Amino acid sequence: MAAPVVTAPGRALLRAGAGRLLRGGVQELLRPRHEGNAPDLACNFSLSQNRGTVIVERWWKVPLAGEGRKPRLHRRHRVYKLVEDTKHRPKENLELILTQSVENVGVRGDLVSVKKSLGRNRLLPQGLAVYASPENKKLFEEEKLLRQEGKLEKIQTKAGEATVKFLKSCRLEVGMKNNVKWELNPEIVARHFFKNLGVVVAPHTLKLPEEPITRWGEYWCEVTVNGLDTVRVPMSVVNFEKPKTKRYKYWLAQQAAKAMAPTSPQI
């Protein structure tokens, strides 16, 4: 009895399976979220890379033919010389358009230039980006216009995501005097954000506890970034210490140097 012959799937079968996978999985990831009765945006992104072009010209020029006649081509007229090969031109980076927010890369709709290894091994297979073809650029421009009109859900910017990540690792210290009666308000907290952490925070984006803060202790404050993400930052209210001037620090350094200098014995 002859052994059964197992044949490997052909290119057509593999192409059909890949097409079903893209239609079922990746295309769903590329679809933006809408608000209310917003019009649906056609998100049939092009998932194929632009093919290069090879430009050639004839080595021997074809002589002009008579009116109404076709030019006579000989064997030498089928010899071509290469002018430009855009298909095999070396490219350092890969231009992609992000379909989702990617840490340290960008947000949806950003045109980024990344290494080929990052684009082909992570961004493209996971549906996080598509090739920056003219068709995809046009689709994202239409999506950007709809987002500006408020017909699509807002997304956080790259700077906003970096701010949120930074605030999650911060702790704010607010110094208040002990010789006057005081109550902490958003304006004071916003000034200390800029003074101590270097972050510009508008007072209307801050939220403090409902009970008035009139004593030293451990509290919290919430910061809303671009009206989308809210971060709770630990806050310590401590006694205010006046910063020492440069002159005072110089005098302290001189006193310390004198104390460390060896004294000569008296005769």
UniProtKB/Swiss-Prot annotation:
This protein's record includes keyword Hydrolase: no
InterPro entries reported for this sequence: MRP-L9_N (IPR056864), Ribosomal_bL9 (IPR000244), Ribosomal_bL9/RNase_H1_N (IPR009027), Ribosomal_bL9_N (IPR020070), Ribosomal_bL9_N_sf (IPR036935), Ribosomal_bL9m_C (IPR054302)
KW Transport (keyword) present: no
SUPFAM superfamilies: L9 N-domain-like
Pfam families, alphabetized: bL9m_N, Ribosomal_bL9m_C, Ribosomal_L9_N
GO cellular component: mitochondrial inner membrane; mitochondrial large ribosomal subunit; mitochondrial ribosome; mitochondrion
Record note on quaternary structure: Component of the mitochondrial large ribosomal subunit (mt-LSU). Mature mammalian 55S mitochondrial ribosomes consist of a small (28S) and a large (39S) subunit. The 28S small subunit contains a 12S ribosomal RNA (12S mt-rRNA) and 30 different proteins. The 39S large subunit contains a 16S rRNA (16S mt-rRNA), a copy of mitochondrial valine transfer RNA (mt-tRNA(Val)), which plays an integral structural role, and 52 different proteins.
Protein name per UniProt: Large ribosomal subunit protein bL9m
Protein species of origin: Homo sapiens
